[in-house]
Amino acid sequence: MQAFAVAALSIWLCLGATTLAESLAQSHGPQHCTSPNMTGVLTVMALNGGEIKATGHYHYDTTDKKLRFTESDMHLNKSEHLEDYLMLFEEGVFYDIDLKNQSCRKMSLQSHAHALELPAGAVHQVELFLGSDTVQEENIKVNIWMGSVPETKGQYSVSTTVGDCLPLSTFYSTDSITLLFSNSQVVTEVKEPEVFSLPSFCEGLELEDTHNDFFSIFNTV
């Protein structure tokens, strides 16, 4: 827990954040918020080695809790096929899709928690400015939240923008993994809703009962 707190604090300092408001213990703080529909780029880094685990485009449907992530071919360290995931959080299912070979696996998701939605149990910590103290137009006001995922025994720190609740980054840690998820080039709409349609070769598959969750999936890519 101590290592988690130190790492989370280091991330905030590296962002050059300036404290705007006091902690939740000294104020009521904002209410839990919900992400909008989003299209953007998600980058995943393993902090214990500095390795880029994955980077690619995603679409997120906040109403139906669906996520499609397609790894970018610019991720040059990949020796195998580029990852393509369809995650259905409400159903507790995700599909590992290989469009090139028209193959697919249907697997269970252990947890609904992920990096593009503030988890239900998140507790507000502080409100911050990211950017310049003097040039207000360059500032981004963010909320920092922390919490744990009981199903995975993991802990997280999430930064979301004030107002529209865009998740900018998520730090996630367990005894075995330490990951940083960075969200960029965000548009608050799903431009291609058809990406959530299941390819025909994925239909009718038997569900594989696994211990996968959003975070462990990206740790193993």
Curated annotation (Swiss-Prot):
Pfam families assigned to the protein according to its UniProt record, in alphabetical order: Ependymin
Primary location recorded for the protein, binned into one broad class: secreted
GO molecular function, one term: calcium ion binding
GO BP term (any one): cell-matrix adhesion
Keyword Signal (UniProt): yes
Keyword terms: Calcium, Disulfide bond, Glycoprotein, Secreted, Signal
Signal peptide: 1-21
Localization annotation: Secreted
InterPro entries: Ependymin, Ependymin_CS
Tissue distribution of the protein: EPDs are synthesized in the meninx and secreted in the cerebrospinal fluid.
Entry keyword annotation includes Transport: no
GO cellular component terms attached to this protein's record: extracellular region; lysosome
SMART domains given in the database record: EPEND (SM00026)
Record's comment on post-translational modification: Binds calcium through the terminal sialic acids.
Sites where a glycan is attached: 37, 77, 101
Biological role stated in the UniProt entry: May play a role in neural plasticity. May be involved during axon regeneration.
PANTHER family attached to this UniProt entry: EPENDYMIN-RELATED (PTHR10697:SF5), MAMMALIAN EPENDYMIN-RELATED PROTEIN 1 (PTHR10697)
Assembly behavior: Forms disulfide-linked dimers.
Similarity-based family: Belongs to the ependymin family.
Protein name: Ependymin
Organism whose genome encodes this protein: Esox lucius
Lineage start: Eukaryota, Metazoa, Chordata, Craniata, Vertebrata
